[in-house]
Amino acid sequence: VGTRVVVDPLMGPGDMLGTNRSGAYAEYVVVPATNVFPIPDTLGFEEAAALPTVYQAEDVQPHDFDTDRPYLTYTADGETHRLDCDFIAGCDGFHGSSRQAIPEQVRTEYEKTYPFGWLGILSETPPVDHELIYANSERGFALCSMRNANLSRYYIQCALSDRPEDWEDDTFWTELKRRLPEDTAEKLVTGPSIEKSIAPLRSFVCEPMRWGRLFLCGDAAHIVPPTGAKGLNTAASDVHYLYHGMVAHYQDGESEGLDRYSETALKRIWKTQRFSWSMTNLLHRFPEQSEFDLHVQAAELAFLAENEAAQRALAENYVGLAY
């Protein structure tokens, strides 16, 4: 499948601009956005290889992964099925069964929660800009992004106690405009939302990411706050390391890649966690922030806007560290 990846970049010039208005500091960070590959390509590969795909499976459970004969059980169409495996890749998300199957006495979980969420809407409106916009204002964080020429997604920082139904569309648009510079707010095209949700923010890592023949990938092993846009990127790096480990195992009879999977993946994950955590601290307003904290935050934003080396470091981390 990797040889058929279709890349459709929405490239920007990579500028970073800072605007100081009415005592509020708004920061723009502009980076390329890339669609990895369309789902039909993956489905076409499965069809060509005559591989069965089971959708809507329930109660998926890994078994005996500490032996050389692991297997999965799952329920589909009202019947229980068994799938014998060489290895199990646990790609079932934060709430899946894979991580929980690793014994508690060998599993260490690190977690940090944040005192706010992101209220996001999707609207069939042209984007306010073809570039991604991050804004840190005295009223809190805001993000403007495009899905296509007539579909936009916007986010604002909100209280964890808020509910989507608490926010009428007009209230959301008014608050978003307040968090953007006037010239940007004036260009904002508003309209009815077609989707509205609130996402809490957390940082999470599980160690190890391998136990026996069970390998954790993506959200099953780690969560990052969306500020750094590293969730899918980090999941892809996990799959990269696991894929190459399996290729070496099956083609060359080597086990080093699989044996070192957890160690290798975690080195990159913690760097990604650091970046996502730092971006979250940089761009949000925290309830406990002092005037000193706010001045340091503003100074960091100004430094990023003015210093090319800092911009390069941010861009390298935002696009994704090499793997």
Where are the model-predicted features located?
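A conserved FAD-binding loop/helix module that cradles the flavin
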Residues: 226-236
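NAD(P)H dinucleotide-binding glycine-rich loop of Rossmann-like/cofactor-binding domains
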Residues: 8-58
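Active-site flanking residues adjacent to catalytic metal/cofactor-binding acidic residues
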Residues: 91, 218-219, 237
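FAD-binding beta-loop-beta segment adjacent to the flavin cofactor pocket
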Residues: 200-216, 220
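Conserved FAD-binding catalytic core of PHBH/FMO-like flavoproteins
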Residues: 60-201, 206
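C-terminal helical "tail/cap" subdomain of flavin- and related membrane-associated enzymes
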Residues: 227-229, 244-323
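Catalytic P-loop NTPase motifs of RecA-like helicase/translocase cores
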Residues: 97-98, 223-225
